[in-house]
């Protein structure tokens, strides 16, 4: 009888220890802060305010939880908007298991039959910096994006630092040179699409489309159901490509990690 009581207590304490460990993983030590309002890049005339968490050692479990609740990650910084009087940023995710390829997407795959792909931990080389700055200079001329050359330190802090065991870069190589870099997180329930840049001299390859289609392929290989696309703002040209990858779900708001996120089926036509 005493042994039975001992084992009951042992099991209870084991469960409590596991629950506490789960809570610790979902609430890591962080430095929390907000930025002062600045001009919105998505809606002219609006102001942006971001809520940030700086976490030096975020677990995959934590990142999975917050990405599914509308947060984004750059380096060791996690963030989501808390804009005054505006809630236009909606989170999107692709339903991988039911994904449907369009004719134009199949053409993009065929056009990249000779494009070499490497998946590895994020890295920093002169080729990365050159390509990143070339792409943003092109977008400045074409779409009036704000632009200044990124330094190696800035690139490292944004795209290499904080990758831990889940961050990856997908390198696209053609003619023996780097022509595209896709930064992603491979999480417990999906792939979080962080940032993509490419060589505008290879615009005919539709690398932006192809990179997302490769994420679909990668997610299927890992048996992951979702690809998290980040934010969509109605009428914003920079996000116009996102609804083309169907089917999708949309999330309104940024629920706490203790709350279940309410994702619903969505298309831009609905």
Kindly give the residue locations of the regions a language model identified.
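Short, positively charged and aromatic/hydrophobic N-terminal segments
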Residues: 5-18
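Helix-boundary/low-complexity linker signature
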Residues: 22-37
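A conserved beta-strand-loop-helix scaffold within acyl/acetyltransferase catalytic domains
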Residues: 77-84, 98-204
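A residue-level signal for conserved active-site and pocket-lining positions in enzyme catalytic cores
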Residues: 66, 132, 242
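Active-site/acyl-donor-binding loops of N-acyltransferases
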Residues: 80-81, 90-97, 226-270
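Acyl-donor-binding surface of acyltransferase catalytic domains
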Residues: 16-17, 36, 40-43, 50-125
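Aromatic (often tryptophan-rich) hydrophobic motifs at membrane interfaces
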Residues: 170-251
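Short secondary-structure junctions
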Residues: 29-32, 72-76, 248-252
């Amino acid at each position: 009888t005493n042994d039975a009581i001992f084992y009951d207590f042992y099991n209870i304490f084991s469960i409590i220890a596991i629950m506490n460990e789960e809570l610790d993983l979902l609430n890591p030590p962080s430095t929390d802060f907000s930025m002062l309002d600045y001009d919105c890049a998505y809606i002219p005339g609006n102001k942006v305010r971001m809520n940030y968490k700086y976490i030096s050692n975020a677990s995959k479990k934590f990142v999975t939880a917050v990405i599914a609740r509308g947060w984004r990650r750059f380096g060791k910084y996690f963030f989501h908007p808390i804009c005054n009087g505006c809630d236009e940023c909606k989170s999107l995710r692709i339903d991988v298991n039911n994904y449907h390829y369009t004719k134009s997407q199949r053409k993009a795959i065929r056009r990249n039959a000779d494009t070499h792909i490497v998946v590895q931990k994020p890295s920093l080389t002169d080729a990365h910096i050159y390509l990143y700055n070339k792409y943003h200079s092109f977008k400045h001329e074409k779409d009036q994006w704000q632009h200044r050359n990124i330094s190696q330190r800035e690139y490292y802090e944004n795209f290499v630092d904080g990758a831990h065991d889940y961050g990856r870069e997908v390198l696209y190589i053609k003619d023996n040179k780097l022509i595209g870099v896709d930064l992603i997180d491979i999480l417990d329930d999906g792939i979080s699409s962080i940032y993509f840049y490419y060589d505008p001299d290879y615009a005919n390859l539709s690398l932006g489309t192809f990179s997302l289609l490769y994420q679909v392929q990668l997610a299927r290989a890992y048996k992951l159901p979702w690809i998290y696309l980040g934010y969509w703002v109605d009428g914003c040209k920079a996000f116009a490509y996102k609804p083309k990858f169907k089917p999708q779900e949309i999330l309104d708001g940024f629920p706490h990690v203790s709350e279940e996120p309410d994702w619903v089926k969505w298309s831009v036509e609905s």
